[in-house]
From Swiss-Prot:
Protein name (Swiss-Prot/TrEMBL): Diaminopimelate epimerase
The gene coding this protein: dapF
Annotated organism of origin: Pseudomonas paraeruginosa (strain DSM 24068 / PA7)
Reactions catalysed: (2S,6S)-2,6-diaminopimelate = meso-2,6-diaminopimelate
Complex formation: Homodimer.
InterPro entries: DAP_epimerase_AS (IPR018510), DAP_epimerase_DapF (IPR001653)
A single GO molecular function term of this UniProt record: diaminopimelate epimerase activity
Biological-process GO terms, alphabetical: lysine biosynthetic process via diaminopimelate
Enzyme class: isomerase
EC number from the UniProt entry: 5.1.1.7
Residues of the site described as Could be important to modulate the pK values of the two catalytic cysteine residues: 161, 210
Family the entry assigns: Belongs to the diaminopimelate epimerase family.
Organism domain of life: Bacteria
UniProt-annotated catalytic positions: 75, 219
Entry-linked PANTHER family: DIAMINOPIMELATE EPIMERASE (PTHR31689:SF0), DIAMINOPIMELATE EPIMERASE, CHLOROPLASTIC (PTHR31689)
Length: 276
């Protein structure tokens, strides 16, 4: 059978989006890996699936698969594309929608200028909720990697993140340290690793090594986690502009217990069909 899909991106973080509300199919990891190959398939960082809600409290169910076939809890850039997709496909007429993810419920708001604001909910900072192995919650933790001590903050935005402050993201060891920290045993479910350069209290640069993907052009949850870590450490103040290789995100966070608000673009690239 043939399935219709839309290729989208948020700041260069690219997605294949499938509507499984009006189409019906059982997508398996082998399909995701086949479609995700940039040489022989569609090629993407993540596959986003739109499904009917499982409860009346939400409008849709939002599922996310990395290109390696693994299902993950959350994707912020994908959430913005999800919001644009369901409106463009007229699956909803609402400007504000609630969607259910593996990482919890998030709210998506489409602005008149076409940008999308995502209420990502409050960050989770307790080690057991991230999950991260530590005796107690702290602003930062020391991790040993190949005999070297690395200091990072641990934050969950529905998915686990480690955030390191660096002097310059251009020379940061993203491709050497990133994959080692991603699979570090203190992150039982692996982690996305952000390398944060603070420019001033309201402006920072970020590169992210994403779990199961590698470095991407942008990571929405990574930008949220970096802003939270920076604000908690006193390096940053809300609102924060986070510059990623693919572009800029606007992050607001009022402090503990408050939701993180992320605003940025969502772009449709093309429509296509794939064989299941």
């Amino acid at each position: 059978m043939l399935l219709r899909f839309t290729k989208m991106h948020g700041l260069g973080n690219d997605f294949m989006v499938l509507d499984l509300v009006s189409q019906h199919a059982h997508v398996q990891p082998k399909h995701v890996k086949l479609w995700g190959d940039r040489n022989t398939g569609v090629g993407f960082d993540q596959l986003l699936i739109v499904e009917a809600p499982s409860s009346p409290d939400v409008d849709f169910r939002y599922r996310i698969f990395n290109a390696d076939g693994s299902e993950v809890e959350q994707c912020g850039n994908g959430a913005r594309c999800f919001a644009r997709f369901v409106q463009d496909k007229r699956l909803t007429v609402k400007k504000s929608i609630r969607v259910e993810t593996k990482g919890g419920i998030i709210e998506l708001n489409i602005r008149p200028d076409g940008q999308v604001t995502v209420d990502m909910g409050p960050p989770r900072l307790a080690p057991a909720e991230i999950p991260f192995q530590a005796e107690r919650e702290a602003l930062s933790y020391e991790i040993e990697v190949n005999g070297q001590r690395v200091e990072l903050a641990a934050v969950s935005m529905g998915n686990p993140h480690g955030v390191l402050r660096v002097e310059n993201v251009d020379s940061a060891p993203v491709h050497s340290l990133g994959p080692q920290l991603e699979v570090h045993p203190r992150f039982p479910k692996k982690a996305n690793i952000g390398f944060l350069q603070v420019l001033d209290p309201h402006h920072a640069r970020l590169r992210v090594w994403e779990r199961g993907v590698g470095e991407t052009q942008a990571c929405g949850t990574g930008a949220c986690a970096a802003a939270v870590a920076g604000i908690r450490q006193g390096w940053l103040q809300s609102p924060v502009q986070i510059d990623l290789p693919g572009g800029r995100l606007h992050i607001e966070w009022a402090g503990p217990g408050q939701p993180v608000m992320m605003t940025g673009p969502a772009v449709r690239v093309y429509e296509g069909q794939v064989r299941l």
